[in-house]
From Swiss-Prot:
The protein's name: Tubulin alpha-1 chain
InterPro entries to which the protein is assigned, alphabetical: Alpha_tubulin (IPR002452), Tub_FtsZ_C (IPR008280), Tubulin (IPR000217), Tubulin/FtsZ-like_C (IPR037103), Tubulin/FtsZ_2-layer-sand-dom (IPR018316), Tubulin/FtsZ_GTPase_sf (IPR036525), Tubulin_C (IPR023123), Tubulin_CS (IPR017975)
Binding site for GTP: Q11, E71, S140, G144, T145, T179, N206, N228
EC code: 3.6.5.-
Species annotation: Paracentrotus lividus
Residues under site feature: Involved in polymerization: Y452
């Protein structure tokens, strides 16, 4: 088996976790108490969904997941919510004091009291796996627990499980909507710390998702539940190939192989289509080519940046539902001919395609319409550097005045860590810039006169 362990850190991570597990349960027909009427092999068996759920002898399906937060209120909602019976009480780990939006508290002072309990729990989950494939880590960049504790955890996971892949689903601080003043600090510190430990990081930006909810689903004032359910659909599309049998299945390491050209350039952009309300879906015929085209609209992206300004290094299309390869090839051919998609010149236009016959599931009473087919596009484009540039600029404005820095230093950090992290991110921006430069331009400077 190729099991995956999901780790949900901090408020954002836990709430994304709620949405994801709610959706997985619906997709697999697992009831909130963990029973699965359709499952004939009690206590194990080699079903595809066993990558995400372990089975007890009593036929109960338990998520291979850990929820961690440094303060109890958010996880308490899981403990008392609809799915309280799904999780083992020890999978829900909480501390007593908050990280208070402070990376240093999450990473040094408060975080270090919880880290061993968490690793111990993860070790127990890992021991139940026959062939652990890797970890999915859900967190935000802006919060104290999400930034500080996640980076501490990733460092420790690299030590304990060196070769296992680690994928992140991270909430990137939105350009306009801010939940904390110090988000740029936390984001840059956590990115610097986790850069070498993460194999692939899917970023989601709240503002981009707010806009999608407003525009496509006609929700005037989207709540976190609306946002998380949409994120859940994306996570579900990415992990569907691990949980179902399909014609063209992709596994975790396969994503990395196809999306990450250089170890540091591992931030793919996710786009999902169709995001449409039930009222509209009833009147529209969403063909494969339509949903494929929608993926190249910046409006459907999960992070605000414009791929038309950047170049693509890799592109991965994950279809689910009623889709045949012939339609996909036709759709891609059309896009290649008429779209202004620019690939870097050292990477021939390759689209990796995955098809999963399980149609997309929606949460009953949710906002999304039930559709026959959907697609999630993961593309590695140099445009995402815009997101880093925005963040770096905000960091610089505050750090020039050393605003708020004393809170971090007071928790045992050194000021040098700030400048070190900032330099690392400057290097990351530079890396993205260099990757996008045509190799012909780069070589042309050295060798003149070699014209054939």
């Amino acid at each position: 088996m190729r099991e995956c362990i999901s780790i949900h850190v901090g408020q954002a991570g836990v709430q994304m976790g709620n949405a994801c597990w709610e959706l997985y349960c619906l997709e697999h027909g697992i009831q909130p108490d963990g029973q699965m009427p359709s499952d004939k092999t009690i206590g194990g068996g080699d079903d595809s969904f066993n990558t995400f759920f372990s089975e007890t002898g009593a036929g109960k399906h338990v998520p291979r997941a850990v929820f961690v937060d440094l303060e109890p209120t958010v996880v308490d909602e899981v403990r008392t919510g609809t799915y309280r019976q799904l999780f083992h009480p020890e999978q829900l780990i909480t501390g007593k004091e908050d990280a208070a939006n402070n990376y240093a508290r999450g990473h040094y002072t408060v975080g270090k009291e919880l880290i061993d309990i968490v690793l111990d729990r993860i070790r127990k989950l890992a021991d139940q796996c026959t062939g652990l494939q890797g970890f999915l880590i859900f967190h935000s960049f802006g919060g104290g627990t999400g930034s500080g504790f996640s980076s501490l955890l990733m460092e420790r996971l690299s030590v304990d499980y060196g070769k296992k892949s680690k994928l992140e689903f991270a909430v990137y601080p939105a350009p306009q909507i801010s939940t904390a003043v110090v988000e740029p600090y936390n984001s840059i510190l956590t990115t610097h710390t986790t850069l070498e430990h993460s194999d692939c990081a899917f970023m989601v930006d709240n503002e981009a998702i707010y806009d999608i909810c407003r525009r496509n689903l006609d929700i005037e004032r989207p709540t976190y539940t609306n946002l998380n359910r949409l994120i859940g659909q994306i996570v579900s599309s990415i992990t569907a190939s691990l949980r179902f049998d399909g014609a063209l299945n992709v596994d975790l390491t396969e994503f990395q192989t196809n999306l990450v050209p250089y170890p540091r350039i591992h931030f793919p952009l996710a786009t999902y289509a169709p995001v449409i309300s039930a009222e509209k879906a009833y009147h529209e015929q969403l063909t494969v080519s339509e949903i494929t085209n929608a993926c190249f609209e910046p409006a459907n992206q999960m992070v605000k940046c414009d791929p038309r300004h950047g170049k693509y290094m890799a592109c991965c299309l994950l279809y689910r539902g009623d889709v045949v390869p012939k339609d996909v090839n036709a759709a891609i051919a059309t896009i290649k001919t008429k779209r202004t998609i620019q690939f870097v010149d050292w990477c021939p236009t390759g689209f990796k395609v995955g098809i999963n016959y399980q149609p997309p599931t929606v949460v009953p009473g949710g906002d999304l319409a039930k559709v026959q087919r959907a697609v999630c596009m993961l593309s590695n484009t140099t445009a995402i550097a815009e997101a880093w540039a925005r963040l770096d600029h905000k960091f610089d404005l505050m750090y020039a005045k050393r605003a708020f820095v004393h809170w971090y230093v007071g928790e045992g950090m050194e000021e040098g860590e700030f400048s070190e992290a900032r330099e690392d991110l400057a290097a990351l921006e530079k890396d993205y810039e260099e990757v996008g430069v045509d190799s012909a331009d780069a070589e042309g400077e050295e060798e003149e006169g070699d014209e054939y």
